[in-house]
Amino acid sequence: MCESNAYLRKPGVEDSIFLEMVDRVYNQEDDLVLEDIFGRKKIIKAKIVELALVDHKIILVEK
């Protein structure tokens, strides 16, 4: 499988998992919408700060 996991980064804290097995990421106005392989969606006011493609990681920071 080639899905990535999305992590939320906060200062001084280890990155925490936000959503596993992410299949799609897209903008919806000021939000990011992440959808997993089962069609579950999570919406967050955040920006992508890093895509680690080999490690299958999407790193987010809240706006």
What are these regions (language model features)?
Residues C2, A6-K63:
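Compact, glycine-rich, soluble single-domain proteins
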